[in-house]
UniProtKB/Swiss-Prot annotation:
UniProt keyword Oxidoreductase present: yes
Family to which this protein belongs: Belongs to the azoreductase type 1 family.
Name of the molecule in the record: FMN-dependent NADH:quinone oxidoreductase
GO molecular function, one term: electron transfer activity
Pfam families for this protein: Flavodoxin_2
EC assignment: 1.6.5.-, 1.7.1.17
Purpose: Quinone reductase that provides resistance to thiol-specific stress caused by electrophilic quinones. Also exhibits azoreductase activity. Catalyzes the reductive cleavage of the azo bond in aromatic azo compounds to the corresponding amines.
Lineage: Bacteria, Pseudomonadati, Thermodesulfobacteriota, Desulfobulbia, Desulfobulbales
Gene3D superfamilies hit by this protein: 3.40.50.360
Catalytic activity: 2 a quinone + NADH + H(+) = 2 a 1,4-benzosemiquinone + NAD(+); N,N-dimethyl-1,4-phenylenediamine + anthranilate + 2 NAD(+) = 2-(4-dimethylaminophenyl)diazenylbenzoate + 2 NADH + 2 H(+)
Organism from which the protein derives: Desulfotalea psychrophila (strain LSv54 / DSM 12343)
Length: 212
């Protein structure tokens, strides 16, 4: 039995290319073992706490090994509960559209919440930063309107580069990427792009969850 946490970053549901490819991955994951479980975190329907003064004060006190106030401790507990939910999975799947060469703001908000000292990373003067989410696979599906891979436009890709940097920072080493591009093209080409990405998702899920 395995638990997959699926983090959905597009609000477009079944109109989203990244979401549709993710569904092919999920179906294959569920076929691998009847006991497998999927938990979906729709970032457009999940209440994320504000990153406000109390939370920031708590964070910096923790970074400096100081005790937070009662209000700061409450804010930190709310954050810690979300991080605990995130870490309570065996593997991960993100579906992400490109917005303005980067990621949707809801996903950035979520990342700012889960990237926490003592919870998903640690720091020491001797060894520097060390990620704490280790030994788990993460698959990221990126949808983008233009062709970025293998073109001059690759320098504008702050979607995949940012996600891989962040995931590596908090400890992931087994990171897999599926790119759905270009989607802003004619209907026939768009369907070919989608079909190719779905097949790639199915093949990867079979490999990760021992269906081959």
């Amino acid at each position: 039995m395995s638990k997959l946490l699926y983090i959905e970053a597009s609000p477009r549901k079944n109109k989203s290319f990244s979401t549709r490819v993710a569904q092919s991955f999920i179906n294959t994951f569920l076929d691998a073992d009847p006991a497998n479980r999927i938990e979906t975190l729709d970032l457009w329907d999940f209440p994320l706490p504000e990153v406000d003064g109390s939370y920031l004060s708590a964070k910096y006190k923790i970074l400096h090994w100081q005790d937070p106030t009662e209000a700061e401790a409450r804010a930190w507990t709310e954050i810690a509960n979300i991080v605990s939910q995130f870490k309570d999975a065996d593997s991960y799947l993100f579906s992400i559209p490109m917005w303005n060469f980067s990621i949707p703001y809801k996903l950035k908000h979520f990342i700012d919440i889960i990237t926490q000292p003592g919870l998903t990373f640690m720091f020491s003067p001797e060894s520097g930063y060390q990620g704490l989410v280790t030994g788990k696979a993460c698959t990221v599906i990126y949808a983008r309107g233009a062709q970025y891979r293998g073109t001059k436009g690759s320098t504008l890709d702050f979607q995949k580069t940012y996600m891989e940097l962040l995931l590596s920072f908090i400890g992931f080493e087994n990171i897999h990427s599926i790119r759905v591009e270009p989607t802003l093209t004619d209907s026939a080409s768009r369907e070919r792009v989608l079909a190719t990405a779905k097949l790639e998702a199915i093949s990867l899920a079979k490999e990760l969850y021992s269906l081959i």
